[in-house]
Amino acid sequence: MSAKKPLALVILDGWGYREDNSDNAIANANTPVMDSLIANEANTLISASGFDVGLPDGQMGNSEVGHTNIGAGRVVYQDLTRITKSIADGDFFENEALTTAMDKAINAGKAVHIMGLMSPGGVHSHEDHIAAAIEMAAKRGAEKIYLHCFLDGRDTPPRSAQNSLERFDALFAELGKGRTASLVGRYYAMDRDNNWDRVEVAYNLLSAAKADFTVDSAVAGLTDAYSRDENDEFVKATEIRAEGQESAAMVDGDTVIFMNYRADRAREITRAFEADFTSFVRTQTPALAEFVMLTRYAANIKLPAAFPPATLKNTLGEWLSKKGKKQLRISETEKYAHVTFFFNGGVEDEFDGETRSLVASPKVATYDLQPEMSAPELTEKLVAAIKGGEFDTIICNYPNGDMVGHTGVYDAAVKACEALDGCIGQVVEAIKSVGGQLLITADHGNAEMMINPETGGVHTAHTNLPVPLIYVGDKSLTLKDGGKLSDLAPTMLSLSDIEIPAEMTGQVLFDLK
């Protein structure tokens, strides 16, 4: 069999386009390869946020949303909008998974624990959903409602949690029941890279009220954390308990509702509540009445989900498999789930003909300490796969722009972009050497805005700006403007001379000659 000439899609995570060069790590980095590609190859900008990816208008994109839209070849109605709509329609308050779980605890006189990322950021959760769950528990008769706050500072400004905490203090006062019971940064509660020592801190706080600090109010806990120079993301385990209040530790018969809807950073803390969990020794294992996931975090987590995934038929991965094509998915640990699970529309298992390759992300506290991450090793494997002649289609994600962008350290983000540029040069050379085709894009922006232009503070969140799309291959092809992420799969099928399934409603972004 002759060697295949692959079509590779390289996703530069967090590599957005912004006209303003100020505090723009991408524009100000020394990137001769990317500059040359923009000057000499077909390229355009495409949308990766808001309505174009199934989010509310103006809402910044994120990796889960981006990869789901890319892989689906159609705009996918995201969990954020789906859940928000259900609250507005009233369906949320009759959701069977939620009502059953709450009523089990309420009828036994036990507590309803509501936990999640306390944030208006809309990436992993939304505090409006958390407020609705609290109101629902109160209306159903819960007397003990405990809110466990994971603080953001990553998809929101680094010190922005106070407004949210005050909002919920006011809500509990209005309801006349319930309280905020704990605070902890998402660094501990929402790890996704098997840093079980961090997860253990959060688990002990939630299950046993074991904390580094105990204070009498949420705002006091936050103020103390700031005085220790801890931004929201890194706030240490803090119990909120005023004198005379009983502990909010979880006990037998309690119910837990986990209000994050994005799966990747919800899995580890959820697994810590499973009966057969062994990644660290648990000091307390309450026999909960129910633990409800807002969405399904993984197929092998056997817990109820309030909003199970909608099934996406004939995603790019499934369609390539049906057509007998060989495909490779490759990334570092940090974005491995995105090029596999999310790209496949929430399908955990590989399709026939799909190979997965994982490169371990470096074990550092924060990625500004190693901005190149594992890009050199990833590139070595990617180049070998391109030249190996085995695969028809290759999907690769480089996490650097996003993961280093999230640290808010500008110089490190510049170094990350420069490291990537060298890697892209090797990939382009490999593609050309085998007569293949290459598309370079991003799932959302991040590193192009390292300072918030409104506040002047460090900007660690994603952006709602467009992302590049570059094509290396047939010089006769030109790219259309006005595209979006969901146009990539039909475009790739067209480039591969494969028919496009009816479910893919995205447009082909080439003016085919």
UniProtKB/Swiss-Prot annotation:
GO BP terms in the entry: glucose catabolic process; glycolytic process
Any one cellular-component term (Gene Ontology): cytosol
Pfam families recorded: iPGM_N (PF06415), Metalloenzyme (PF01676)
CDD domains documented for this protein: iPGM (cd16010)
Keywords (A to Z) from UniProt: Glycolysis, Isomerase, Manganese, Metal-binding
Enzyme Commission designation: 5.4.2.12
Domain of life: Bacteria
Cofactor comment: Binds 2 manganese ions per subunit.
InterPro entries per record: Alkaline_phosphatase_core_sf (IPR017850), BPG-indep_PGM_N (IPR011258), Metalloenzyme (IPR006124), PGAM_B_sf (IPR036646), Pgm_bpd_ind (IPR005995)
Keyword Manganese attached: yes
Job description of the protein: Catalyzes the interconversion of 2-phosphoglycerate and 3-phosphoglycerate.
PANTHER family xref list: 2,3-BISPHOSPHOGLYCERATE-INDEPENDENT PHOSPHOGLYCERATE MUTASE
Family to which this protein belongs: Belongs to the BPG-independent phosphoglycerate mutase family.
This protein's name: 2,3-bisphosphoglycerate-independent phosphoglycerate mutase
Lineage, uppermost ranks: Bacteria, Pseudomonadati, Pseudomonadota, Gammaproteobacteria, Vibrionales
